[in-house]
Structure formats: structure tokens, C-alpha cells
A protein has these predicted regions:
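Short, well-ordered coil/turn segments that N-cap beta-strands
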Residues: 42-47, 67-72, 89-91, 114-116, ...
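Sec/Tat-exported extracytoplasmic proteins
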Residues: 18, 41, 63-67, 88, ...
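Conserved, mostly hydrophobic/aromatic
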Residues: 14, 37, 49, 166, ...
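Distinct, well-ordered alpha-helical segments
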Residues: 55-65, 81-95, 99-110
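C-terminal active-site rim and adjoining tail of enzyme catalytic domains
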Residues: 24-28, 96-97, 103-189
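Extracellular/periplasmic catalytic domains that process cell-envelope and extracellular macromolecules
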Residues: 6-8, 39-42, 65-66, 86-88, ...
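A mature extracytoplasmic/lumenal domain signature
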Residues: 10, 18, 51-55, 77, ...
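An active-site metal/cofactor-coordinating segment within enzyme catalytic domains
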Residues: 1-43
Length: 189
């Protein structure tokens, strides 16, 4: 219910606001802390921590303190993955892997493929099929994100048409802000 950037407020100041649901209705819920989200999610879901503006050291300290078991860490390069892996050997990753050079960097850094899901971009590209094949040979699922593309369409009809077009390119995982819109779509294409 607030206005402006979250980063312009302290956490205490943010507690005066309530969260709004996807239909624009004000709820009774407040903005939770990451620790509260981790506690709530235990036994319910897996959280993908894609934290862009927090130093690696801060996240590593948090990981060592909280020891979350239901978390996947989004990393943008092999160095970040190695940093977390050295502190939490069983860490699971969503690794940005959009080309063969990035794939090779993860290999050289010794990141275990069994602990990786690869974010390959906003869509599957035919020219990157050799990369997808290499990932699949290593047991890695390829994930795309429609958040920056089809999720921004104005209507639900436009969103679902975009989703269906991406399904036909055969990604293993589709990240979206609107998972409920996938109900009823043909996921077999």
C-alpha cells in the first residue's frame, strides 16, 4: 500500500504498509523478512533466492547462520557458484548459463551439475541447441523466464498465448509471476 522504492525505507518503516494481492486487493499481510519467509516455506515449497544487490559475503553469512534446506541460489557466474559451494557443499543453484563459454566456466570451477538448474535466458533459441544438449547430457534442466516478456502483456489472454508459444520450444522449467495462468495450457508440445 506504500509508494516509491522499497529501498527508500527502513524495514521498520515498511511495516506501516500492507501487501496487495494480484487482484489489487489490500491484505492484512505485512512484508516479511527473508528469515520469516524461510520459516514459512519449510515443508511447503522451495525458494529461489535471486538476490542482486546483496554482497556475496552477506548472503554467505546468512546461509551459515540459517542453514536453509529448501533454497536454490541464483548465481550469475561460476565464481559466485564456487563462493557459495565452498561454504555450503550441498547448495543447489539456478546458474545463468546462456552460452558455451559460461557452461565451460562452470565445468572449470568444478560446480557439480547434479546441483544445478540452468537459466538459459528468456527463451529457448534454436542456435543454442548444442548448449541445451550438453546441459541435458549432464542431467541439468533448462529454465527460461517469461517474467521480462510474456508476463508483461496487458491481458491474461495475451500472456497465455505467449506462454503457449514458449512451451512449444520445450524448456524444462518456465519461471513466471503468474503460474496459475498455466492451468489448462497444453504442456506436451
Amino acid at each position: 500500500t506504500g509508494k516509491g522504492k522499497v529501498s527508500d525505507y527502513t524495514y521498520a518503516e515498511l511495516q506501516q504498509f500492507n501487501l496487495v494481492d494480484r487482484n489489487g486487493n489490500v491484505t492484512t499481510f505485512k512484508i516479511p523478512t527473508l528469515k520469516e519467509c524461510l520459516e514459512w516455506s519449510k515443508g511447503k515449497t522451495i525458494l529461489n533466492l535471486d538476490i542482486k544487490d546483496v554482497p556475496l559475503e552477506v548472503m554467505a553469512d546468512f546461509i551459515e547462520t540459517e542453514k536453509p534446506v529448501n533454497v536454490i541460489y541464483t548465481v550469475h557466474n561460476a565464481g559466485q557458484a564456487r563462493y557459495y559451494l565452498d561454504r555450503k557443499p550441498d547448495a543447489m543453484f539456478s546458474c545463468w548459463c546462456k552460452n558455451r563459454e559460461e557452461f565451460d566456466n562452470y565445468e572449470k570451477a568444478g560446480i557439480p551439475w547434479k546441483q544445478v538448474m540452468a537459466y538459459v535466458g528468456p527463451k529457448m533459441k534454436p542456435e543454442q541447441q548444442p548448449l541445451y544438449d550438453a546441459l541435458h547430457r549432464n542431467g541439468v534442466m533448462c529454465m527460461i523466464s517469461v517474467a521480462p516478456t510474456h508476463d508483461r502483456a496487458k491481458t491474461e489472454t495475451e500472456k497465455t498465448a505467449g506462454y503457449q508459444s514458449e512451451i512449444s520450444t520445450r524448456p524444462d522449467v518456465i519461471e513466471t509471476d503468474y503460474p496459475y495462468l498455466f492451468q489448462g495450457l497444453d504442456l506436451t508440445k
